Amino acid sequence: MGVRVALLSVGVLARSQKENERRLPIHPLHVDRIEAGLRPSVHLEHGYGERFGVPDEQLADRVAGLRGRDHLLADCDVIVLPKPVADDLRQMREGQVLWGWPHCVQNADITQLAIDRRLTLIAFEAMHQWSGDGSFHVHVFQKNNELAGYCSVLHAMELTGITGEYGRPLRAAVISLGAVGRGAVTALTALGVTGVHVLTHRDVAAVAAPARSARVVHFERDPGDPARCQVLGGHGRVPMAAYLAGFDIVVNCVLQDTGAPLMFITEHDLPAFTPGTLIVDVSCDAGMGFSWARPTSFADPMFTVGANIGYYAVDHSPSLLWNSATWEISEALLPYLKAVLGGPAAWDSDQTIRQAIEIRDGVIQNPAILSFQHRAAQYPHPRL
């Protein structure tokens, strides 16, 4: 008879300290789906289902109980919080596990707190399903990524008062066709934008157009300036900035290589763009893609560059449609709850979880964090 392994306790938080973040990790209507054997280890924050019209009384007998945030942070082994900020980690005790989107590579403060407090960070953004040969198959939270593209386009077009269905015809360029790009094209098509060009670094013949009216074109790094790009079309090689200047809406959906980032448009390129052009930076990384790039917030979602060119870069745009986003996050997360609560041995036996651990007991596991933040390889990973 096998030895029964004690499960870790998990605290599922209902509120983020990130302004206007409304997504939850488990949809209140999905709590019934939690395996019976896991429920004694699952604790929810008071008011967990409030925004969804689900009272605590309806959830109480389906989990170990509902408790205040401070009690969950003090007592639970694992904290599930989709969008943590540095202050959340400051409230955690040494040795705890955080499961969410920490984005450690670009976030030195969160990384340092995890090191100092010997935390383990299991990153949603690094959770992938893998093929039998060890190759990448699909991102676990791809539907949330689609929603990022969808919500960013929806919100930005609303803020600028435009739609393709009415008013002058609009043309849009979407850079990259992963899940984020598919969501962006879905929104553009739904909003009546018919002239959509999708730019991909893959072979055009290997890429299916995401919409009947979309045209797929190829781009690649400029051999003479690898940080810049060229578009290969019927007229030969064209600098990407010049190509993009022919569109009313430009949507960036590129997952940047932080070690060799791409630059699509700089301030020097802006005079070629028509006033009123809208740039939607879904996959915003500060200083990458656009020379002025920086994340924005729901409180101040856009700013103007050049001659009245709008720039949108809300870094958690799926929170716009928080109920639908919560549903998709929950669908993706629940199959991995057992492995996470199983503790270190269970993590190591599950490839998706094992490879999503960015920091383990304070020790950095992802080399990209070390290189981007210029840290030493050995704990405590001082900045070099």
Locations of regions flagged by a protein language model:
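Short glycine-/small-residue-rich Rossmann-like dinucleotide-binding loops
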Residues: 83-84, 102-103, 254-258, 283-284, ...
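Rossmann-like adenosine-cofactor binding region
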Residues: 205-307
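Glycine/serine-rich phosphate-binding loop and adjoining beta1-alpha1 elements at the start
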Residues: 2-9, 13-15, 87-171, 314-316
